[in-house]
Amino acid sequence: MKIAISADSTCDLSNEICEKYDIHLNAMPFSLGEDDLRHDGVTGTTKDVFEYVEKTGKLPTTSAYNEYEYTEHFNKLLKDYDAVIHVSFSWEISSTGANARRASENMQNVYTIDSKNLSCGFGLVVLECAIWAQMGKSVEEIIKHAEEVRDQIQTSFLVDTLEYLY
C-alpha cells in the first residue's frame, strides 16, 4: 500500500527532508497586515515576519485551513496514493487539526494524528511517520508508532525576547 504522509508547514521540516521522505506539506496561511495574505514557505518566510514586526510593531495573524481546503488536499494526494496519514500540530492550540479530522471523517483511507506538539516536536512525529511509510509499514502500524513517539516527546525552547509571543 502506498501511503502519503501529510503535515502542516509549522512542523518546521526543511524542504530537503520533505523531498527525501516524501512528506507533503500544507503551507499555513498568515497575514502581514490587512491585505497581505501569505503562505508559510511559499509566499512568506520567517524573515518576512521578523521584518514586519520590526517595521510595524505588530504581530502577524494566522488562520487555519478549513475542512474544504483539507478535503481538496487529501483528494489530490489520493490520486497518487492508496491512503493519507495527516499529522497536525497540537489540536489544543489550533482548530487546524480539528478541521483536518472533520474532513478525514468524510473520506476513505484518510487518517489524522494529533502530534500534541509544536515546531520540532511536531516535526519529529511527522518524520517518524514518513520513515515508517518508506519502510512499508501499514497505516495501523504507522499510527500506533506515531502515537508512541509523540507521547515521549518533550519540547523546550528559549527566547531572547517575549516580543513575538502572545
Language model segments and positions:
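N-terminal glycine-rich anion-binding loop in soluble enzyme alpha/beta folds
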Residues: 4-64
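Glycine-rich, highly charged phosphate/nucleotide-binding loops
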Residues: 62-72
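Short, well-structured alpha-helical segments in soluble
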Residues: 72-80
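Short glycine-rich or small-residue beta-strand-to-loop segments that form or flank ligand, phosphate
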Residues: 83-90, 111-114, 128
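Short Gly/Thr/Asp-enriched flexible loops that form oxyanion-binding sites at enzyme active sites
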Residues: 89-107, 124-127
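Long, charge-dense
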Residues: 113-125
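Short, small-residue alpha-helix embedded
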Residues: 122-134
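Internal, active-site/partner-interface "lid" segment
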Residues: 132-166
